[in-house]
Amino acid sequence: MKMTSKKMKDELMKKLSRPEWDFHYDSEKEVLRIEQKDSKKGINVSLPGVVAKWEVNKEKAIEEVAYYVQEALIAMHKEENSAAKILPVIRSTSFPKQAEEGNPFIMTDHTAETRIYYALDSNKTYRLIDERLLQKLGLTEQQVREMALFNARSLSYEFKQDTVAGNTFYFLNTNDGYDATRILNESLLQSMREKISGDMVVAVPHQDVLIIADIVNEIGYDIIAQMTMKFFAEGHVPITSLSFVYEDGDFEPIFILAKNRKKTDGKEKG
């Protein structure tokens, strides 16, 4: 049979068919481009050159080119992933649990209002890790969690502060996409706990802010409630309008504490 560029294109597409790769054929230049769907990085194959090799080596020529393209694309993908970081992100418990039907995200419970997801961050963009991506990365869920928490501890933090009616409010807003993630840095929380004299209240109304407050009176609780609601309404990626009292590594939603206070007050009146 006579081999043409179009037939060679079909042969290579059969050999290199993978769900994560795309093909683009330029019939004028007789070039087939194979590229990664996510990154758009790829390889251009000049088909007349492959046809010339096929005239001499037949099937072996196709095998060699397919092998070269496959190895090059896999190497690009590994290089891309090695440059990427895995970081945790905080989301509301109402956030979707699946990327698509049958492909759940990797998640960890956090509080009654929040859940931890995991992002593969390549500086320009990030993608939440689901089971299919986990398999491509060749990692276990435990490895992802450990890597993410380690990287979360390396995130810098510098708070702005404001004092109202004796209550001090600390704001973190770097806009790096991971401000709320700092709530997972246990050493940061412990260091703040040491400098706080009243109740330590923490809020993550949306992904680009972390609020830590030193609450010493009821006015402080009213202020943090209003503040959290305002930030929640304005956030690009809202998380929760509730704030939490932090004590001994636990987060207790404020509305639960308020209910408990009301019950106690009721008993005392009776």
From Swiss-Prot:
Coiled coil: none
Pfam families hit by this protein: DUF1444
Lineage top rank: taxon: Bacteria
Bilayer-crossing regions: none
Similarity field: Belongs to the UPF0354 family.
Classification via HAMAP family: UPF0354
Name of the protein in question: UPF0354 protein BCE33L4443
